[in-house]
């Protein structure tokens, strides 16, 4: 199969320059791109430091696997800001003249691969985190004995490799990534849908993203319900409530941020794939949906920066003082692991625990 696009590298940019209907202000866009990239890099760097410190603290506990996956997600967001933001700033600074600086279409391909990878990989990792927490809450004994850091690292590597495969799939199929109508970013072909393959890449991307969001929503719902049931049924194990509350708030925040930021872009890509050249989606709509998606990489780290136990405790105290409510005893914020409380509750209700208690009592009688 011959690659016509590689023989005529100028045509992708040339066609868009001639027919562009979506323009952006260069100076303003460069300024905002630099601000977005800087804030994203600093936020993710701070979140990485916090998560790594927490991982060292909980290395031997059930929360370590959650922190390891969360660190992978934030690191992915960090490199997404670094690579995509750096290329975007360069494109704006070069007056979006792709013919001059990317005649071979190499930079556009790198940009497109990075966009797909940095978009799907955090969604996949968010789903993996939701599944891991769901198992850890609903079956804590299995989680603590069978799911080790080695397994989590293998899952993390597998998720990243699959995201890389999806990102390079068009290149393997001899399809170049295309410069979009705004001439500021590269992605799958969205302007002139030619055949089923163009539709497939867009639908596949949207399907995987929406599937990841659906899995996260389902698992987080099960996790939240289970934690609430444990909280109300096991009042004697009050020391675990701090991590219960911290986990519920973080999981809900991650899910809400991902859904709000990514749903418009995923639905927009699916709409373009289904309707093809007759799609009512405009360049401005696509660009707005893309900017919404990029906010996910900025907001993700703040979930782990702000929604920590120490911060929530201070916010609770501040809110109580502002509202004039007496601060109740904050025993719910005592240091403990969710593993301990859930494991005690699970063991106390299991048949094996009853047998062990009977054996212990018989031995004591002897």
Swiss-Prot record:
Subcellular location(s) per record: Cell membrane
Species annotation: Mus musculus (Mouse)
Cytoplasmic side: 56-69, 132-152, 225-250, 308-366
CC terms in the record's Gene Ontology section: cytoplasm; extracellular region; plasma membrane
InterPro entries per the UniProt record, alphabetical: GPCR_Rhodpsn, GPCR_Rhodpsn_7TM, PglndnF_rcpt, Prostanoid_rcpt, Prostglndn_DP_rcpt
GO aspect biological process, one term: positive regulation of cell population proliferation
Gene: Ptgfr
GO molecular function terms listed in the Swiss-Prot or TrEMBL record: prostaglandin F receptor activity
Record Gene3D superfamilies: Rhodopsin 7-helix transmembrane proteins (1.20.1070.10)
This protein's name: Prostaglandin F2-alpha receptor
Membrane-related topology note: Multi-pass membrane protein
Cystine bridges: 108-186
Keyword line: Cell membrane, Disulfide bond, G-protein coupled receptor, Glycoprotein, Membrane, Receptor, Transducer, Transmembrane, Transmembrane helix
Recorded superkingdom: Eukaryota
Function description: Receptor for prostaglandin F2-alpha (PGF2-alpha). The activity of this receptor is mediated by G proteins which activate a phosphatidylinositol-calcium second messenger system. Initiates luteolysis in the corpus luteum.
């Amino acid at each position: 199969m011959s690659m016509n696009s590689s023989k005529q590298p100028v045509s992708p940019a040339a066609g868009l320059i001639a027919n562009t209907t979506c323009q952006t202000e260069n100076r303003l866009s460069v300024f905002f791109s630099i601000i977005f990239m800087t804030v994203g890099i600093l936020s993710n760097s701070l979140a990485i430091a916090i998560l790594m410190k927490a991982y060292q603290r909980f290395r031997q506990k059930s929360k370590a696997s959650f922190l390891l996956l969360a660190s992978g997600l934030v690191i992915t967001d960090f490199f997404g800001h670094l690579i995509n933001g750096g290329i975007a700033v360069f494109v704006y600074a070069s007056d979006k003249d792709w013919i001059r600086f990317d005649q071979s279409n190499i930079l556009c391909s790198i940009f497109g691969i990075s966009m797909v990878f940095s978009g799907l990989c955090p969604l996949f990792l968010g789903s993996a985190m939701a599944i891991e927490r769901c198992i850890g809450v609903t079956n804590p004994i299995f989680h603590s004995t069978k799911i080790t850091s080695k397994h989590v690292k293998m899952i993390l590597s597998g998720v990243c490799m699959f995201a890389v495969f999806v990102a390079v799939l068009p290149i393997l199929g001899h399809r170049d990534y295309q410069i979009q109508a705004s001439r500021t970013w590269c992605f799958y072909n969205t302007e002139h849908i030619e055949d089923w393959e163009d539709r497939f890449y867009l639908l596949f991307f949207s399907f995987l993203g929406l599937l990841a969001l659906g899995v996260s929503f389902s698992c987080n719902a099960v996790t939240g319900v289970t934690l609430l049931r444990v909280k109300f049924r096991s009042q004697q194990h009050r020391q675990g409530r701090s991590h219960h509350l911290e986990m519920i708030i973080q999981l809900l925040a991650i899910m809400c941020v991902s859904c709000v930021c990514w749903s418009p872009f995923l639905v927009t890509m699916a709409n373009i794939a289904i309707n093809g050249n007759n799609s009512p989606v405009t360049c401005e709509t696509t660009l707005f949906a893309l900017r919404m998606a990029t906010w996910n990489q900025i907001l993700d780290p703040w979930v782990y920066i702000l929604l920590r136990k120490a911060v929530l405790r201070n916010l609770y105290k501040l809110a109580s003082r502002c509202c004039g409510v007496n601060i109740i005893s904050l025993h719910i914020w005592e240091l403990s692991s969710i593993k301990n409380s859930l494991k005690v509750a699970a063991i106390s209700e299991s048949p094996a625990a009853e047998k062990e208690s009977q054996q212990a009592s018989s031995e004591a009688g002897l």
